[in-house]
Amino acid sequence: MKDLNHIKHFYFIGVGGIGMSALARYFKAKGNFVAGYDRTSTELTRMLEDENIEVNYEDDITIIPETILNNQENTLIVYTPAVPKDHKQFEFLKKKNFEVVKRAELLGMVTDQKYCLAVAGTHGKTTTTAILGHLLKETGAKVTAFLGGISEDIQSNLIMQGDKVVVVEADEFDRSFLKLSPNLAAITSMDADHLDIYGDKSELEKSFREFAAKVPEDGKLFVKNGLPVNGSSVGINDNSDFSAQNIRIEEGSYVFDLKTPSETIKNLKFNLPGNHNLLNAITALAMAIEYGTSIHDLTRALYSFKGVKRRFSYKIKKDHLVLIDDYAHHPTEISAVHQAVREMYPNKKVLAVFQPHLFSRTRDFAEDFASSLSDFDKVFLLDIYPARELPIEGISSAWLLDKISNTNKALIQKKNLSEMIKTEEAEVVVMMGAGDIGEEVEKVKKALLHEA
């Protein structure tokens, strides 16, 4: 692999992905030529275009920018595992002997010579990474942070405030996180997921243990209390090394004390609802403290954190009507959203709208999906979002709907979604999924506010 310092041109195949777009922004900010392909135009790709990153939406070799084609010696082609094997642009550039790397490899190269803080976990890593990046940024650290979601604080998935320390989301998909060299790391959860890649939970756990082993002796690993990995423990109301104690809700925010191995910090305030988010905050605080950030500065920085888009994002927040958008696509995440909603709105009728993501995940966790969704007052299911997969015979949203014990349920087509939600008169509507349901949220919001 060439030295990254010699690369002046980058072409990202799948540039609209959350991890890819952060890298594209990073190299653009460094003064390089950056362009890319994606299958569809989204809010994120339009933002990239506004930042003078050229994006094309047709898999056609004739529209690859001339700047890329004419500068092979100092050009790098970056791709994700989601790119199909028969992608014409990708195949063409490989045959022309352009240097090609996976996104995870490039992220590994970027972080290799820097002090690296990495957050892994099947759930919680995006929010934890965003909180950690925010804490370091707000306390004056010279930090670059690659986020797996759009921070509500900066409306971006990239923080660039220097390069003394790098914060990254360490993705277990395709074992990507094994390309990283973290100095400090965290594992927020190790629930079974991505079984299409790993086969079974034991292989997934083995991969997390390999990630944990990458932390050097002079570094530190933080783990959620109870996980089968050794490290400094993080928890809520327990005997963890870092634990939230004396938790109460005041004016819609958490107020709590943080017990650390050396002291207890009183009356921290945090604005995101749900025990899962509180645990994310404790993990980020523990890592920031270990990095050497002042406790006093962290208190102020934590309170100012606004959140991550599509992570319990309020789209409407009125006394009689609440619309929440969330990326939850695993039964554990759905249950966490349910806990947060019930904690904030204990006496209100809650409608859950869920778009399953991947046929394989729907099949592998069908009973757990049915159980977690049944806890809501009413459930609307959309068709399964296939992403990288072909259909699996017998696996459908109708099949999943049959397993939901709650009788207040229905299978809904996207074109009818806004009207169906309007007729429900639910006080709280939660829209969940990792597919394109996020694109439907604005339509639903308009319909509920009678703007449609």
Swiss-Prot record:
Gene: murC
Keywords recorded for this protein, A-Z: ATP-binding, Cell cycle, Cell division, Cell shape, Cell wall biogenesis/degradation, Cytoplasm, Ligase, Nucleotide-binding, Peptidoglycan synthesis
Protein name according to UniProt: UDP-N-acetylmuramate--L-alanine ligase
Keyword ATP-binding belongs to the record: yes
Organism of derivation: Christiangramia forsetii (strain DSM 17595 / CGMCC 1.15422 / KT0803) (Gramella forsetii)
Protein purpose: Cell wall formation.
Top-level taxonomy: Bacteria, Pseudomonadati, Bacteroidota, Flavobacteriia, Flavobacteriales
InterPro entries cross-referenced by the UniProt entry: Mur-like_cat_sf (IPR036565), Mur_ligase_C (IPR004101), Mur_ligase_C_dom_sf (IPR036615), Mur_ligase_cen (IPR013221), Mur_ligase_N (IPR000713), MurCDEF_pg_biosynth (IPR050061), UDP-N-AcMur_Ala_ligase_MurC (IPR005758)
Compartments where located: Cytoplasm
Record: residues binding ATP: G121, T122, H123, G124, K125, T126, T127
